[in-house]
């Protein structure tokens, strides 16, 4: 039975109605025989609100206290999601990063994952539970709560998928995938069906949806990542190597036929007033 790790970002969780919708989608997947592990971000802009409150009290909040505070948004989301799943008659349990065994270094605010002890997660899955994990967080050698910095929930999801030997890591967001350019700026931007890890890293370094650290993890562990819309049932953008893509299609995990396309510009990103063009695989 395949394991799928699904990560939902803040815009996908910013209302009770959206949480209910995700719970219904998860139930459908469970009924199809899939094992689902959910990783959730904080609801909407709640992390920004927590930081704002801390800054109202101190211009330089203690980093240990700040990480403890900032981790709470994801914990709220995970508990609410678990409650929503239980209301649909499903067995579900929420876990903090600590409870999920996510061991990090002690760099508060920008912690790096060292290892994951996934025994608790496996035990819960084997007991028929849908495990909902608070993203963006872990714990250090002194059992202090740490946060992973920008893009931390993406990093959590890919790292967990690799640790659990999941078939795929699905990242749900407010767009239907990666585009050839920012669709808010370029009206005729087109969705990209397939990207190599290397191409996605190039785009991620200059502002595309996922943080480079999560893509690097995907590359290191050969974990396929698909970026999809939380609100539309569309195919998204698959990030992996071509051999893994062929394997996923053969096994029916990726249903739409996608082929590698080498000799075209992949995408254009921008950062401030700086432009950069990188060309790959240009024919002689």
Where are these regions (language model features)?
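Nucleotide/pyrophosphate-binding catalytic subdomain
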Residues: 1-215, 219
